[in-house]
Design a protein with these regions (language model features):
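Cytosolic-side transmembrane-helix boundaries in multi-pass membrane proteins
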Residues: 1-44, 164, 201-232, 241, ...
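Membrane-helix/interface signature in polytopic inner-membrane proteins
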Residues: 207-222, 268-307, 468-470
Length: 472
């Protein structure tokens, strides 16, 4: 594509696809931003009915700390579900690692940093054990992790004697600590939190600039400049607003350390799933295992490392929870696997595998977190909270199932089809797969017309094979 062509692609009129391009394009991306819109609506509704408590700095910080471990579990769970598996043991594994880490510091005199290394190593060992059964023995992940859920729950209660084990103050920092204050700066905000927000916004601007530059260099079609500007302005406003919100919290508090750990994991795993060979193999195996194997993907190895990674993240989540609670107890981790699975499905993952994103799972987890928090602020009972969470999960998965039924367009697809001008998807077959199979076969090509005098005459066929023996 020439530079003239590239400029032409940027100077067209308004199209509905420009809005889609603002968010990355594709039905899965639109679904994620639909969920993000639902999250914003939930927050605003509870903000109104709670008299402004939902978005108060103290409450937002509390939500980040209280649900960070569920969001960390959702990061690993989405990879497991993309592969077509399920992990029911994450809550028990988190509790098991938590009690071992607490005992190692309280009774075995481990320093806090050595206890963290022990916990991560123990999570990797548990994950390797379960991954071995799933990947190389062939036992379904549902059965393996169900057994793990029972085994490690019992191990937690056996090792801890069904009592709470406290942890030292240094360890508490990873679950209940905050970014430090900088003395001598006369502003009513936490400076490290503001710096973190500015750096995040600057990285977002740089990333968008680099993306457009690469598109221009490759000659691919770019969205209009106003699309990139609007997207960057909106996202930077959200980031800087969050930085101001966290930085103006209770005296002595700022952005929590558990939130820093969560953000680091989100960035890391978003990169792994989107920009590495291993991430592409996860989607390939989850989408079509046989085709991936024929393409040379070692599906068993992918199964093994995905299961091991899930247990490592469960160990991290368990240690953060123990640090925030300042002790490890026998009831830690109960129901965590259900919250993580619900977050992944609400975030747009497919039950059949092959579809899902880290960002979508985080958004789904935040939906669950603010639902819980908002109903608690409004003094709803635990029974009502559970019923609402179940209804939200059912609706989210039901919408996904409806969108995938052959011959039925999704709501987003219907709007896109109605609003795009003719030729918007020229050259792309949008017929559902099931409908294609029912279409009539293409008509036979027309018989050739009379041959012109200028057309070359084909060579005469050798009819020697048709002659009778002995004929000349």
């Amino acid at each position: 594509m020439t530079s003239t062509d590239t400029k032409t692609t940027e100077k067209h009129g308004f199209r509905f696809s420009d809005i889609r391009g603002m968010f990355g394009g594709g039905q899965s991306t639109l679904r994620q931003f639909g969920i993000l819109g639902s999250l914003i609506a939930i927050i605003l509704i509870f903000q109104i009915f709670s008299d402004g408590l939902t978005l108060s700095p103290g409450n937002v910080i509390n939500v980040m700390q209280q649900y960070s471990y569920i969001l960390i579990l959702a990061i690993g769970m989405v990879m497991v579900i993309i592969m077509g598996h399920i992990d029911l043991s994450v809550g028990s594994v988190a509790a098991f690692v938590g009690i071992v880490v607490a005992k190692s510091m309280a009774e075995w005199n481990f320093p806090w940093w050595a206890a963290i290394i022990l916990g991560i190593g123990l999570g990797a060992l548990v994950g390797a054990w379960q991954g071995l059964w799933v990947a190389y023995v062939g036992v379904p992940a549902f059965i393996v992790t169900l057994a793990g859920m029972l085994f490690f729950r019992g191990a937690n209660q056996w090792i801890g004697d069904s009592i709470s084990v406290p942890v030292p103050k240094e360890f508490v920092t990873i679950g209940a600590g905050y970014l430090p204050e900088i003395a001598g700066i006369p502003i009513p905000y936490n400076v490290p939190t503001l710096i973190l927000g500015v750096l995040a916004a600057a990285w977002l601007v740089f990333f968008e600039w680099r993306t457009r530059r690469q598109q221009k260099k490759m000659g691919s079609e770019r969205a209009p400049l106003w699309v990139s500007v609007v997207k960057v302005v909106l996202l930077c406003a959200v980031i800087l607003g969050a930085a101001l919100l966290f930085g103006s919290g209770r005296p002595g508090t700022s952005f929590p350390v558990s939130g820093i750990i969560l953000l680091a994991l989100v960035i890391l795993y978003s990169f792994v799933t989107n920009h590495t060979v291993f991430g592409r193999h996860i989607y390939a195996v989850g989408g079509n295992r046989q085709a991936a194997k024929l393409s040379g993907v070692k599906d068993r190895r992918v199964d093994f490392f995905v299961m091991m990674n899930m247990s490592v993240l469960a160990a991290v989540a368990g240690m953060i929870f123990v640090a925030r609670s300042q002790a490890s107890g026998p009831q830690d981790g109960n129901g965590w696997e259900l919250d993580a699975i619900a977050a992944v499905f609400i975030g747009g993952a497919a039950v059949s595998g092959g579809i899902g994103t880290v960002i979508g799972s985080i958004i789904g987890g935040l939906v669950m977190a603010f639902l819980n928090n908002g109903m608690q602020l409004l003094s709803f009972g635990a029974d009502t909270v559970q019923m609402v969470k179940g209804a939200v999960l059912l609706v989210a998965v039901g919408i996904d199932a409806y969108n995938k039924q052959q011959g039925r367009p999704s709501v987003l697809g219907f709007l896109t089809k109605r609003r795009n001008p003719p030729g918007e998807f020229a050259g792309i077959d949008t017929t559902p797969i099931g409908a294609r199979a029912m279409e009539a076969p293409p008509a036979a090509p027309p018989a050739p017309g009379p041959r012109s005098s200028s057309s070359p005459t084909p060579p005469a066929a050798d009819d020697s094979a048709t002659k009778e023996p002995g004929s000349r």
